[in-house]
A protein has these predicted regions:
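Glycoside hydrolase catalytic-domain groove-lining segments
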Residues: 1-87
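Loop/turn elements at helix/coil->beta-strand transitions in domains of secreted/extracellular proteins
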Residues: 63-68, 112-118
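Surface-exposed substrate-engagement region within the catalytic domains
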Residues: 78-113
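Aromatic-rich peripheral "rim/lid" segments of glycoside hydrolase catalytic domains that contact
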Residues: 85-86, 99, 110-115, 122-186, ...
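Short, well-ordered beta-strand segments enriched in hydrophobic/aromatic residues
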Residues: 175, 201-210, 346-354
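Activation corresponds to long, low-complexity, non-globular regions
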Residues: 194, 396-431
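Ser/Thr/Pro-rich, low-complexity mucin-like regions
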Residues: 215, 299-304, 310, 321-401
């Protein structure tokens, strides 16, 4: 490229390749600054839809005098999202494997339409060791290879997945209860029962409540992880517990189920309060036993008043604690890799990614410490037990939370390879 710059004057009158044929340099706009070419673009595709990716590719191809190959293009199947695409819907994360395949095919069509010579999908396989800007504060970056952080989008751009378990995962959230055993049970009153298991990616729960009837009633699962904070009362839902809970899992139908976190233990507040509320989170922190529980959100875009001139603009966030209903078994015809929970009569089967519960390194059972007590941000403590309960919200007394033992796996990671649905989509496209 340096040689091109040095010899640009000599090349001014030479013909160039426009992606389809050899034409004069003046016809293509080759060498024109990209910023100028962007001002000339209309940003629409052939169907009349706004497509900034195609517009960028057209400009990039016009700027150069040689064939252009797009060295990487891709989207992530991670549960977490780092950026929302405003016009094509090809988000950086929170896309199912089928949506990933569709997005890759659309990107390839744009690459070909723009006149580029080709491109390379990013990437062949998932990468557990990766980090991303809107979750890296929440995890131990020295330990990311030893667990699968489904909240970090950067780890899941691959066409090949590394799923937990040597041959299969310990649980598939699909409504088939045959994989659950008596050893998994934490409590069983006859009218209610709760079981738990876990692997390198998720905590899995199976909850039974008499009369639940595929979500006709509500169900609440309080969770206590840290001894430093938590509340015995959840103001949001009017729930009382016999231990201070840090999270409440609210199963409220297919469309309104979510995990909420006690305000004191909300990591977004501790790390991004200035960006979201233009204030210092540490000047007046919530009480350690505050009964207010908040939606769990991820930062998507920090405000840019210097660029926009809007000094009242707040940063963009989205609710990552909201749960998606569906079948999460890869062998099922209705498989949705983003599905969090499914009903099965009076049962609900669900999975929670570790980071959503403020685990910084589950391979060592390391969680977030209190952000405000002699700390300034995310520090870690280690636990060997968490506590969970189950209620329909109509109990007169306090809901009992039962212990669940946690055992770290250290560096001994179990995984198996699986081709994603997006692999099949690209194979069909490139046949």
């Amino acid at each position: 490229y340096l040689n091109y710059i040095l010899n640009r004057a000599e090349m001014d009158n030479k013909p160039v390749w426009d992606g389809k044929a050899v034409v004069s340099r003046v016809e293509t706009g080759a060498g024109t600054p990209i910023s100028e070419l962007l001002r000339q673009e209309d940003f629409y595709d052939g169907a009349g839809a706004v497509n900034t990716y195609l517009a960028y590719l057209r400009v990039l191809r016009r700027h150069h005098t040689m064939p252009v190959v797009i060295s990487e293009f891709g989207v992530s199947t991670g549960r977490g999202m780092a950026q929302r695409d405003q016009n094509t819907g090809r988000n950086q994360g929170h896309m199912s494997e089928q949506e990933q395949g569709q997005a890759l095919a659309e990107c390839w069509e744009d690459i070909m339409t723009s006149g580029c010579a080709g491109g390379c999908v990013f990437t062949w396989q998932d990468e557990w060791f990766k980090r991303t800007w809107n979750t890296m504060h929440a995890v131990n970056l020295q330990r990311t290879p030893y667990w699968s952080d489904y909240q970090t989008n950067e780890q899941y751009f691959g066409l090949l997945s590394f799923d937990p378990g040597e041959e299969e995962s310990v649980c598939y959230v699909d409504g088939d209860l045959s994989e659950w055993t008596e050893e998994d049970k934490l409590l069983d009153t006859g009218e209610r029962a709760l079981s738990m298991k876990y692997d390198e990616r998720y905590i899995y729960l199976l909850a039974y409540q008499e009369g639940f009837a595929n979500g006709e009633k509500r169900m609440f699962i309080p969770i206590d992880t840290t001894p430093k904070t938590g509340s015995t009362y959840c103001e949001n839902y009017g729930l009382r517990f016999d231990r201070a809970a840090d999270f409440v899992l609210a199963i409220d139908g297919r469309e309104n189920s979510r995990l909420v976190v006690q305000e004191r233990y909300e990591v977004l507040r501790a790390m991004f309060y200035h960006e979201t509320h233009d204030d210092d989170a540490y000047l007046d922190p919530p009480d350690a036993d505050t009964p207010l529980f908040k939606p769990i959100e991820l930062m998507l875009q920090t405000a840019t008043p210097l660029l926009t001139g809007n000094w009242q603009a707040s940063s963009e966030v989205y609710e990552t604690g909201r749960l998606l209903y569906g079948n999460a078994n890869p062998s099922s015809p209705d498989f949705n890799s983003l599905a969090d929970f499914i009903f099965a009569g009076d049962y609900v089967e669900l999975k929670l990614p570790w980071q959503l519960l403020n685990f910084a390194d589950p391979s060592r059972m390391s969680i977030h410490d209190d952000y405000y007590d002699d700390n300034y941000g995310v520090e870690y403590i280690t636990i060997d037990t968490m506590y969970l309960g189950l209620t329909d919200g109509e109990d007169e007394g306090r809901t009992a939370l039962c212990p669940a033992a946690l055992e770290s796996w250290g560096n001994r990671v179990a995984y198996h390879e699986r081709l994603k649905a997006s692999y099949d989509a690209m194979r069909r496209l490139w046949r």
